[in-house]
């Protein structure tokens, strides 16, 4: 059983797109895998216009784009609730009263259930590495508690080198294996794109797992062929806390 954590250098750097690419690549290699988004936050334009709300769930709206992309990417039959513990309408629930209701035990239980059913589980964080989950945990401290290996998504833009190297430093200081990093081109007009990737490859000890070019609606496309080092993502076994 393999469980690994996907984090990013910032918000809107393409964690979900890279997660889709990884899921598709591993499935193409014959590996059973699902994605899991513990905490999904609000967005300006919901995918569904007809949103149903229920007071009997942990969800404001079951229309978060990231969760829906993960659900669409896997070959397994999973529901929205199977792969998401909390969806909030607000952008930063962990900084509001809503954050007090985020129960880490529920997240742990949901992860354990998935890891017992499927060969591999890709866990996608929200925002960046040190973002709070609630008053007691950050995504980093939670991943460290489970000893999850990490994949870093670097959105190639101005300032990404500083963000990437600081995140790598924090991951290493927490004693977690960095499986590798993925370059996601989010600014097609950025100069020195190749030079940035070359320099980061020299400075980050972990391998470059793939490069995803800028494209229209990547969430609807086959992206698996952009991930070129599947072995790094499947060889480590993770023991989920009981």
Curated annotation (Swiss-Prot):
InterPro entries recorded: DTB_synth_BioD, P-loop_NTPase
Residues holding Mg(2+): 16, 66, 124
GO biological process, one term: biotin biosynthetic process
Binding site for ATP: 12-17, 66, 184-185
Reactions catalysed: (7R,8S)-7,8-diammoniononanoate + CO2 + ATP = (4R,5S)-dethiobiotin + ADP + phosphate + 3 H(+)
Active site: 37
Superkingdom, natural source: Bacteria
Function recorded in the entry: Catalyzes a mechanistically unusual reaction, the ATP-dependent insertion of CO2 between the N7 and N8 nitrogen atoms of 7,8-diaminopelargonic acid (DAPA, also called 7,8-diammoniononanoate) to form a ureido ring.
Stated name of the protein: ATP-dependent dethiobiotin synthetase BioD
Source organism phylogeny: Bacteria, Pseudomonadati, Pseudomonadota, Gammaproteobacteria, Pasteurellales
